[in-house]
UniProtKB/Swiss-Prot annotation:
Compartments it resides in: Cytoplasm
UniProt source species: Clostridium acetobutylicum (strain ATCC 824 / DSM 792 / JCM 1419 / IAM 19013 / LMG 5710 / NBRC 13948 / NRRL B-527 / VKM B-1787 / 2291 / W)
Names of the cofactor(s): K(+)
The protein's name in its UniProt record: tRNA modification GTPase MnmE
Coiled-coil annotated spans: none
Length: 459
Protein backbone atom coordinates (compact mmCIF):
# COMPACT_ATOMS: atom_id res chain seq x y z
CA UNK A 1 0.00 0.00 0.00
CA UNK A 2 1.30 3.47 -0.90
CA UNK A 3 1.77 6.16 1.76
CA UNK A 4 -0.31 9.32 1.32
CA UNK A 5 -1.39 12.20 3.52
CA UNK A 6 -4.85 12.12 5.13
CA UNK A 7 -7.70 13.60 3.11
CA UNK A 8 -11.30 14.57 3.89
CA UNK A 9 -14.36 15.62 1.90
CA UNK A 10 -18.15 15.62 1.98
CA UNK A 11 -19.32 12.40 0.30
CA UNK A 12 -23.04 13.11 0.12
CA UNK A 13 -24.86 15.61 -2.07
CA UNK A 14 -24.87 19.17 -0.74
CA UNK A 15 -28.30 20.31 0.43
CA UNK A 16 -30.85 19.81 3.18
CA UNK A 17 -31.24 16.16 4.18
CA UNK A 18 -31.49 13.91 7.22
CA UNK A 19 -27.82 12.91 7.20
CA UNK A 20 -24.57 14.01 5.57
CA UNK A 21 -21.35 11.99 5.48
CA UNK A 22 -17.82 13.36 5.71
CA UNK A 23 -15.25 10.79 4.59
CA UNK A 24 -11.68 10.83 5.96
CA UNK A 25 -8.99 8.54 4.51
CA UNK A 26 -5.34 8.05 5.37
CA UNK A 27 -2.95 6.71 7.97
CA UNK A 28 -3.87 9.45 10.48
CA UNK A 29 -7.65 9.34 9.89
CA UNK A 30 -8.49 8.04 13.37
CA UNK A 31 -6.13 10.32 15.29
CA UNK A 32 -7.28 13.41 13.36
CA UNK A 33 -10.99 12.78 13.95
CA UNK A 34 -10.25 11.85 17.58
CA UNK A 35 -9.03 15.43 18.18
CA UNK A 36 -12.51 16.83 17.48
CA UNK A 37 -14.72 13.92 18.62
CA UNK A 38 -16.12 13.58 22.14
CA UNK A 39 -17.93 10.30 22.70
CA UNK A 40 -21.05 10.08 24.85
CA UNK A 41 -19.39 7.17 26.64
CA UNK A 42 -16.36 9.42 27.36
CA UNK A 43 -14.25 7.09 25.20
CA UNK A 44 -12.08 8.34 22.36
CA UNK A 45 -11.91 6.54 19.03
CA UNK A 46 -8.19 5.75 18.84
CA UNK A 47 -8.80 2.19 20.05
CA UNK A 48 -11.92 1.62 17.93
CA UNK A 49 -12.25 -1.80 16.32
CA UNK A 50 -12.70 -1.94 12.57
CA UNK A 51 -16.29 -1.96 11.26
CA UNK A 52 -17.65 -0.42 14.47
CA UNK A 53 -19.43 2.87 15.25
CA UNK A 54 -19.33 5.43 18.06
CA UNK A 55 -21.95 8.00 19.06
CA UNK A 56 -20.92 11.46 20.24
CA UNK A 57 -20.27 15.07 19.21
CA UNK A 58 -17.90 16.89 16.90
CA UNK A 59 -16.50 19.83 18.88
CA UNK A 60 -14.44 22.90 18.08
CA UNK A 61 -10.73 22.17 18.30
CA UNK A 62 -10.00 25.49 20.03
CA UNK A 63 -12.57 25.53 22.86
CA UNK A 64 -14.50 22.24 22.90
CA UNK A 65 -17.85 23.82 21.98
CA UNK A 66 -20.24 21.31 20.39
CA UNK A 67 -20.71 21.70 16.63
CA UNK A 68 -22.98 18.73 15.90
CA UNK A 69 -24.19 15.37 17.16
CA UNK A 70 -22.65 12.57 15.07
CA UNK A 71 -22.03 8.87 14.61
CA UNK A 72 -18.48 7.90 13.62
CA UNK A 73 -17.69 4.64 11.79
CA UNK A 74 -14.22 3.16 11.21
CA UNK A 75 -12.86 0.81 8.54
CA UNK A 76 -9.25 -0.25 9.00
CA UNK A 77 -7.03 -0.48 5.93
CA UNK A 78 -6.37 -2.34 3.76
CA UNK A 79 -9.94 -3.71 4.03
CA UNK A 80 -11.64 -0.44 3.15
CA UNK A 81 -12.69 1.25 -0.09
CA UNK A 82 -9.43 3.20 -0.44
CA UNK A 83 -7.21 0.52 1.08
CA UNK A 84 -6.33 2.99 3.87
CA UNK A 85 -7.79 3.70 7.30
CA UNK A 86 -11.19 5.29 6.62
CA UNK A 87 -13.37 7.20 9.08
CA UNK A 88 -16.86 8.34 8.10
CA UNK A 89 -18.61 11.00 10.17
CA UNK A 90 -22.42 10.94 9.92
CA UNK A 91 -23.73 14.37 10.90
CA UNK A 92 -27.02 16.20 10.40
CA UNK A 93 -27.74 17.07 6.79
CA UNK A 94 -27.72 20.64 5.61
CA UNK A 95 -25.07 22.87 4.11
CA UNK A 96 -23.92 24.68 7.24
CA UNK A 97 -23.55 21.82 9.78
CA UNK A 98 -21.83 19.64 7.17
CA UNK A 99 -19.46 22.46 6.20
CA UNK A 100 -18.59 23.18 9.86
CA UNK A 101 -17.81 19.53 10.65
CA UNK A 102 -15.56 19.31 7.58
CA UNK A 103 -13.78 22.57 8.49
CA UNK A 104 -13.00 21.29 11.98
CA UNK A 105 -11.60 17.99 10.65
CA UNK A 106 -9.35 19.96 8.28
CA UNK A 107 -8.20 22.16 11.19
CA UNK A 108 -7.32 18.96 13.05
CA UNK A 109 -4.86 17.96 10.30
CA UNK A 110 -6.65 16.56 7.24
CA UNK A 111 -6.36 18.00 3.73
CA UNK A 112 -9.38 18.73 1.55
CA UNK A 113 -9.57 15.94 -1.03
CA UNK A 114 -9.43 16.63 -4.75
CA UNK A 115 -12.25 15.38 -7.03
CA UNK A 116 -12.06 11.59 -7.36
CA UNK A 117 -9.13 11.31 -4.94
CA UNK A 118 -10.70 8.58 -2.76
CA UNK A 119 -11.32 6.38 -5.81
CA UNK A 120 -7.86 7.22 -7.18
CA UNK A 121 -6.31 5.96 -3.93
CA UNK A 122 -8.37 2.78 -4.20
CA UNK A 123 -6.89 2.32 -7.69
CA UNK A 124 -3.30 3.13 -6.66
CA UNK A 125 -3.59 0.81 -3.65
CA UNK A 126 -4.79 -2.07 -5.84
CA UNK A 127 -8.34 -2.23 -4.46
CA UNK A 128 -9.71 -1.90 -8.00
CA UNK A 129 -8.41 -1.36 -11.51
CA UNK A 130 -9.09 1.67 -13.69
CA UNK A 131 -12.12 0.25 -15.51
CA UNK A 132 -13.68 -0.63 -12.14
CA UNK A 133 -12.91 2.86 -10.83
CA UNK A 134 -14.63 4.43 -13.84
CA UNK A 135 -17.64 2.19 -13.21
CA UNK A 136 -18.11 3.87 -9.81
CA UNK A 137 -19.05 7.12 -11.56
CA UNK A 138 -21.15 5.19 -14.09
CA UNK A 139 -23.22 3.77 -11.21
CA UNK A 140 -23.70 7.26 -9.77
CA UNK A 141 -24.69 8.68 -13.19
CA UNK A 142 -26.86 5.74 -14.33
CA UNK A 143 -30.31 6.73 -15.62
CA UNK A 144 -32.09 3.34 -15.83
CA UNK A 145 -31.97 -0.13 -14.30
CA UNK A 146 -30.20 -1.50 -17.39
CA UNK A 147 -27.49 1.17 -17.31
CA UNK A 148 -27.00 0.61 -13.58
CA UNK A 149 -26.73 -3.18 -14.00
CA UNK A 150 -24.12 -2.70 -16.71
CA UNK A 151 -22.11 -0.33 -14.49
CA UNK A 152 -22.35 -2.69 -11.50
CA UNK A 153 -21.10 -5.59 -13.65
CA UNK A 154 -18.12 -3.47 -14.73
CA UNK A 155 -17.41 -2.49 -11.12
CA UNK A 156 -17.38 -6.20 -10.25
CA UNK A 157 -14.63 -6.75 -12.84
CA UNK A 158 -16.51 -8.27 -15.80
CA UNK A 159 -14.63 -6.15 -18.36
CA UNK A 160 -11.34 -6.44 -16.47
CA UNK A 161 -11.46 -10.23 -16.58
CA UNK A 162 -12.05 -10.26 -20.35
CA UNK A 163 -9.20 -7.82 -20.95
CA UNK A 164 -6.82 -9.67 -18.63
CA UNK A 165 -7.54 -12.97 -20.43
CA UNK A 166 -6.72 -11.37 -23.79
CA UNK A 167 -3.54 -9.80 -22.42
CA UNK A 168 -2.42 -13.11 -20.95
CA UNK A 169 -2.87 -14.87 -24.30
CA UNK A 170 -0.93 -12.12 -26.08
CA UNK A 171 1.81 -12.31 -23.45
CA UNK A 172 2.14 -16.06 -24.05
CA UNK A 173 2.61 -15.40 -27.78
CA UNK A 174 5.31 -12.81 -27.01
CA UNK A 175 7.07 -15.18 -24.59
CA UNK A 176 7.12 -18.03 -27.14
CA UNK A 177 8.45 -15.73 -29.89
CA UNK A 178 11.19 -14.29 -27.67
CA UNK A 179 12.23 -17.73 -26.41
CA UNK A 180 12.49 -19.04 -29.98
CA UNK A 181 14.51 -16.02 -31.15
CA UNK A 182 16.79 -15.71 -28.10
CA UNK A 183 17.47 -19.42 -27.51
CA UNK A 184 17.48 -21.11 -30.94
CA UNK A 185 19.87 -23.79 -29.72
CA UNK A 186 17.49 -25.00 -26.98
CA UNK A 187 15.12 -27.85 -27.68
CA UNK A 188 11.95 -25.69 -27.61
CA UNK A 189 8.69 -26.22 -29.42
CA UNK A 190 8.97 -24.38 -32.74
CA UNK A 191 6.90 -21.22 -33.07
CA UNK A 192 5.97 -20.56 -36.70
CA UNK A 193 4.32 -17.63 -38.46
CA UNK A 194 1.35 -19.90 -39.09
CA UNK A 195 0.94 -20.70 -35.37
CA UNK A 196 1.19 -17.05 -34.36
CA UNK A 197 -1.24 -15.96 -37.11
CA UNK A 198 -3.84 -18.47 -35.95
CA UNK A 199 -3.57 -17.30 -32.33
CA UNK A 200 -3.76 -13.64 -33.36
CA UNK A 201 -6.84 -14.24 -35.53
CA UNK A 202 -8.60 -15.87 -32.57
CA UNK A 203 -7.71 -12.87 -30.38
CA UNK A 204 -8.89 -10.47 -33.10
CA UNK A 205 -12.32 -12.14 -33.18
CA UNK A 206 -12.75 -11.52 -29.45
CA UNK A 207 -11.54 -7.92 -29.72
CA UNK A 208 -14.02 -7.35 -32.58
CA UNK A 209 -16.89 -8.70 -30.47
CA UNK A 210 -16.05 -6.24 -27.71
CA UNK A 211 -15.78 -3.35 -30.20
CA UNK A 212 -19.16 -4.27 -31.72
CA UNK A 213 -20.77 -4.00 -28.28
CA UNK A 214 -19.48 -0.43 -27.84
CA UNK A 215 -22.23 1.38 -29.77
CA UNK A 216 -24.94 -0.18 -27.60
CA UNK A 217 -22.77 0.23 -24.52
CA UNK A 218 -22.37 3.95 -25.19
CA UNK A 219 -26.16 4.27 -25.23
CA UNK A 220 -26.39 2.62 -21.81
CA UNK A 221 -23.71 4.88 -20.34
CA UNK A 222 -24.53 8.21 -21.99
CA UNK A 223 -28.12 7.77 -23.17
CA UNK A 224 -29.58 7.54 -26.66
CA UNK A 225 -29.05 11.01 -28.11
CA UNK A 226 -32.50 11.67 -29.62
CA UNK A 227 -33.36 14.94 -31.35
CA UNK A 228 -36.92 16.09 -32.13
CA UNK A 229 -36.93 18.21 -35.29
CA UNK A 230 -39.46 19.81 -37.59
CA UNK A 231 -40.87 23.16 -38.61
CA UNK A 232 -42.32 25.55 -36.00
CA UNK A 233 -45.66 24.57 -34.46
CA UNK A 234 -45.69 20.93 -35.59
CA UNK A 235 -45.89 19.77 -31.95
CA UNK A 236 -42.26 19.17 -30.94
CA UNK A 237 -42.52 20.75 -27.50
CA UNK A 238 -45.90 19.07 -26.93
CA UNK A 239 -44.26 15.71 -27.74
CA UNK A 240 -41.48 16.39 -25.22
CA UNK A 241 -44.06 17.21 -22.54
CA UNK A 242 -46.02 14.05 -23.43
CA UNK A 243 -42.93 11.81 -23.17
CA UNK A 244 -41.91 13.42 -19.85
CA UNK A 245 -45.51 13.40 -18.59
CA UNK A 246 -45.00 16.99 -17.42
CA UNK A 247 -45.07 20.52 -18.83
CA UNK A 248 -41.34 21.02 -19.37
CA UNK A 249 -41.48 23.07 -22.58
CA UNK A 250 -43.64 26.12 -23.28
CA UNK A 251 -46.37 25.37 -25.82
CA UNK A 252 -48.18 28.16 -27.72
CA UNK A 253 -49.73 28.71 -31.15
CA UNK A 254 -47.03 31.29 -31.89
CA UNK A 255 -44.34 29.92 -34.27
CA UNK A 256 -40.78 30.18 -32.93
CA UNK A 257 -41.66 29.87 -29.22
CA UNK A 258 -38.82 27.38 -28.65
CA UNK A 259 -35.66 29.37 -29.40
CA UNK A 260 -33.07 27.11 -27.80
CA UNK A 261 -32.61 23.40 -27.26
CA UNK A 262 -34.16 21.70 -24.21
CA UNK A 263 -32.62 18.43 -22.98
CA UNK A 264 -34.23 15.87 -20.66
CA UNK A 265 -33.82 12.13 -19.90
CA UNK A 266 -36.59 9.55 -20.24
CA UNK A 267 -36.61 5.76 -19.87
CA UNK A 268 -38.00 3.47 -22.56
CA UNK A 269 -37.66 -0.28 -21.84
CA UNK A 270 -34.53 0.35 -19.79
CA UNK A 271 -32.88 2.45 -22.50
CA UNK A 272 -31.83 5.86 -21.14
CA UNK A 273 -32.87 8.42 -23.73
CA UNK A 274 -31.52 11.96 -23.77
CA UNK A 275 -34.29 13.68 -25.65
CA UNK A 276 -33.64 17.09 -27.17
CA UNK A 277 -36.42 19.49 -28.17
CA UNK A 278 -35.09 21.90 -30.78
CA UNK A 279 -36.11 25.22 -32.25
CA UNK A 280 -38.35 24.88 -35.30
CA UNK A 281 -36.36 24.75 -38.53
CA UNK A 282 -37.37 27.54 -40.90
CA UNK A 283 -35.99 30.63 -42.60
CA UNK A 284 -36.22 33.54 -40.13
CA UNK A 285 -34.90 37.07 -39.70
CA UNK A 286 -35.19 36.94 -35.89
CA UNK A 287 -31.58 36.88 -34.62
CA UNK A 288 -32.27 34.81 -31.48
CA UNK A 289 -34.53 32.33 -33.29
CA UNK A 290 -31.90 32.07 -36.04
CA UNK A 291 -29.30 31.02 -33.44
CA UNK A 292 -31.74 28.41 -32.14
CA UNK A 293 -32.22 27.01 -35.66
CA UNK A 294 -28.44 26.71 -36.10
CA UNK A 295 -28.18 24.83 -32.79
CA UNK A 296 -30.97 22.52 -33.95
CA UNK A 297 -28.93 21.65 -37.05
CA UNK A 298 -25.82 21.02 -34.92
CA UNK A 299 -27.78 18.66 -32.66
CA UNK A 300 -29.03 16.73 -35.71
CA UNK A 301 -25.42 16.10 -36.79
CA UNK A 302 -24.60 14.29 -33.52
CA UNK A 303 -27.93 12.50 -32.99
CA UNK A 304 -28.22 8.72 -32.53
CA UNK A 305 -31.91 9.02 -33.47
CA UNK A 306 -33.87 11.79 -35.20
CA UNK A 307 -37.62 12.12 -34.57
CA UNK A 308 -38.95 14.21 -37.46
CA UNK A 309 -42.41 15.67 -36.89
CA UNK A 310 -44.64 16.68 -39.79
CA UNK A 311 -47.97 18.49 -39.46
CA UNK A 312 -50.25 16.06 -41.33
CA UNK A 313 -53.00 18.70 -41.54
CA UNK A 314 -50.80 20.70 -43.93
CA UNK A 315 -49.09 19.90 -47.20
CA UNK A 316 -45.48 18.76 -47.20
CA UNK A 317 -43.40 21.66 -48.50
CA UNK A 318 -39.81 22.32 -49.60
CA UNK A 319 -38.54 22.74 -46.01
CA UNK A 320 -39.97 19.31 -45.07
CA UNK A 321 -38.43 17.73 -48.17
CA UNK A 322 -35.04 19.21 -47.30
CA UNK A 323 -35.18 17.52 -43.88
CA UNK A 324 -36.39 14.24 -45.44
CA UNK A 325 -33.39 14.27 -47.77
CA UNK A 326 -31.07 14.87 -44.81
CA UNK A 327 -32.41 12.11 -42.53
CA UNK A 328 -32.93 9.34 -45.11
CA UNK A 329 -29.46 7.84 -44.47
CA UNK A 330 -29.64 8.21 -40.68
CA UNK A 331 -31.63 6.45 -37.95
CA UNK A 332 -34.98 8.22 -37.85
CA UNK A 333 -38.66 8.02 -36.97
CA UNK A 334 -41.20 10.22 -38.78
CA UNK A 335 -44.29 11.27 -36.82
CA UNK A 336 -47.24 12.44 -38.92
CA UNK A 337 -48.69 14.56 -36.14
CA UNK A 338 -52.21 16.00 -35.82
CA UNK A 339 -53.95 13.00 -37.44
CA UNK A 340 -56.99 14.02 -35.37
CA UNK A 341 -57.35 16.93 -37.84
CA UNK A 342 -58.14 16.76 -41.56
CA UNK A 343 -55.29 14.97 -43.36
CA UNK A 344 -53.76 16.89 -46.25
CA UNK A 345 -50.18 15.63 -46.62
CA UNK A 346 -49.16 13.78 -49.79
CA UNK A 347 -47.64 10.51 -48.56
CA UNK A 348 -46.00 9.86 -51.91
CA UNK A 349 -43.46 12.49 -50.92
CA UNK A 350 -42.34 10.14 -48.12
CA UNK A 351 -41.35 7.34 -50.53
CA UNK A 352 -37.66 7.95 -49.85
CA UNK A 353 -38.20 6.84 -46.25
CA UNK A 354 -38.73 3.44 -44.62
CA UNK A 355 -42.50 3.00 -44.14
CA UNK A 356 -41.90 1.00 -40.93
CA UNK A 357 -40.45 4.16 -39.39
CA UNK A 358 -43.43 6.37 -40.26
CA UNK A 359 -46.07 6.64 -37.53
CA UNK A 360 -49.45 8.35 -37.64
CA UNK A 361 -49.52 10.39 -34.46
CA UNK A 362 -51.55 12.79 -32.37
CA UNK A 363 -49.95 14.43 -29.36
CA UNK A 364 -53.34 15.80 -28.34
CA UNK A 365 -55.11 12.41 -28.40
CA UNK A 366 -51.97 10.35 -27.52
CA UNK A 367 -52.43 8.34 -30.72
CA UNK A 368 -49.28 6.45 -31.74
CA UNK A 369 -47.40 6.95 -28.46
CA UNK A 370 -47.00 3.24 -27.73
CA UNK A 371 -45.99 2.55 -31.33
CA UNK A 372 -43.31 5.25 -31.02
CA UNK A 373 -41.91 3.60 -27.89
CA UNK A 374 -42.05 0.14 -29.50
CA UNK A 375 -40.24 1.41 -32.61
CA UNK A 376 -37.44 2.93 -30.51
CA UNK A 377 -37.15 -0.31 -28.53
CA UNK A 378 -37.01 -2.43 -31.71
CA UNK A 379 -34.34 -0.16 -33.22
CA UNK A 380 -32.00 -0.12 -30.22
CA UNK A 381 -32.93 -2.67 -27.51
CA UNK A 382 -31.23 -5.75 -28.96
CA UNK A 383 -30.69 -8.97 -27.04
CA UNK A 384 -27.15 -7.86 -26.16
CA UNK A 385 -28.40 -4.62 -24.64
CA UNK A 386 -30.93 -6.47 -22.51
CA UNK A 387 -28.86 -9.46 -21.39
CA UNK A 388 -25.11 -9.02 -21.90
CA UNK A 389 -22.93 -7.92 -18.99
CA UNK A 390 -19.75 -7.96 -21.09
CA UNK A 391 -20.37 -4.72 -22.92
CA UNK A 392 -17.99 -1.87 -23.65
CA UNK A 393 -19.70 1.31 -22.41
CA UNK A 394 -16.72 3.66 -22.19
CA UNK A 395 -15.37 5.49 -25.25
CA UNK A 396 -11.84 5.37 -23.80
CA UNK A 397 -12.04 1.57 -23.65
CA UNK A 398 -13.30 1.37 -27.25
CA UNK A 399 -10.40 3.52 -28.47
CA UNK A 400 -7.90 1.28 -26.66
CA UNK A 401 -9.50 -1.81 -28.25
CA UNK A 402 -9.31 -0.19 -31.70
CA UNK A 403 -5.59 0.48 -31.17
CA UNK A 404 -5.05 -3.11 -30.04
CA UNK A 405 -6.92 -4.33 -33.12
CA UNK A 406 -4.79 -2.15 -35.40
CA UNK A 407 -1.56 -3.53 -33.89
CA UNK A 408 -2.79 -7.13 -34.23
CA UNK A 409 -3.75 -6.51 -37.87
CA UNK A 410 -0.36 -4.93 -38.61
CA UNK A 411 1.48 -7.87 -37.04
CA UNK A 412 -0.62 -10.33 -39.09
CA UNK A 413 0.33 -8.49 -42.28
CA UNK A 414 4.01 -8.63 -41.29
CA UNK A 415 3.71 -12.38 -40.74
CA UNK A 416 2.04 -12.87 -44.13
CA UNK A 417 4.57 -10.70 -45.98
CA UNK A 418 7.83 -11.79 -44.33
CA UNK A 419 7.09 -14.84 -42.13
CA UNK A 420 9.46 -13.13 -39.64
CA UNK A 421 7.94 -13.65 -36.20
CA UNK A 422 10.47 -11.36 -34.51
CA UNK A 423 9.34 -8.38 -36.64
CA UNK A 424 5.70 -9.08 -35.80
CA UNK A 425 6.43 -9.20 -32.06
CA UNK A 426 6.78 -5.37 -31.84
CA UNK A 427 3.16 -4.78 -32.84
CA UNK A 428 1.99 -7.74 -30.77
CA UNK A 429 3.55 -6.14 -27.69
CA UNK A 430 1.93 -2.80 -28.61
CA UNK A 431 -1.46 -4.57 -28.69
CA UNK A 432 -0.75 -5.91 -25.18
CA UNK A 433 0.09 -2.37 -24.03
CA UNK A 434 -3.06 -0.88 -25.59
CA UNK A 435 -5.29 -3.38 -23.79
CA UNK A 436 -3.49 -2.59 -20.52
CA UNK A 437 -4.65 1.02 -20.81
CA UNK A 438 -8.22 -0.16 -20.14
CA UNK A 439 -7.34 -1.54 -16.71
CA UNK A 440 -4.76 1.20 -16.08
CA UNK A 441 -1.71 -1.06 -15.96
CA UNK A 442 0.01 0.64 -18.90
CA UNK A 443 -1.65 4.07 -18.89
CA UNK A 444 0.49 7.16 -18.34
CA UNK A 445 0.13 8.93 -14.99
CA UNK A 446 -1.04 12.26 -16.45
CA UNK A 447 -3.92 10.51 -18.24
CA UNK A 448 -4.87 8.69 -15.03
CA UNK A 449 -4.94 12.06 -13.23
CA UNK A 450 -7.20 13.49 -15.94
CA UNK A 451 -9.68 10.61 -15.61
CA UNK A 452 -10.05 11.05 -11.84
CA UNK A 453 -10.41 14.84 -12.09
CA UNK A 454 -13.72 14.24 -13.88
CA UNK A 455 -15.07 12.48 -10.75
CA UNK A 456 -17.24 14.30 -8.24
CA UNK A 457 -15.79 15.66 -5.00
CA UNK A 458 -15.92 13.17 -2.12
CA UNK A 459 -15.80 10.08 -4.35
Amino acid sequence: MKEFDTIAAISTAIGNSGISIIRVSGKEALSIVDKVFKGKSKKGIIEMNTYTMRYGNIVELSNGDIIDEVIVSFMKGPKSFTGENVVEVNCHGGMYPTKRVLEEIIRAGARLAEPGEFTKRAFLNGRLDLSQAEAVMDIINSKTELSMKSAVAQSEGVISREINKLRQRILEIIAHIEATVDYPEDDLEEVTAENVSKDLNDILKEIDELILSADEGKILREGLNTVIIGKPNVGKSSLLNLLLDEKRAIVTDIPGTTRDVIEEYINISGIPIKIVDTAGIRETEDVIEKMGVERSKEKMENADLIIFMIDSSKKIDAEDLEIIDYIKDKKYIVLLNKVDLKNREDKSKLDLLNKDNIIEFSVKEKVGLEKLKDTIENMFATGNLQHSNTMITNTRHKEALLRAREHCTTSLKALQDTLAIDLASIDIRNAWTALGEITGETLQEDLIDKIFKDFCLGK
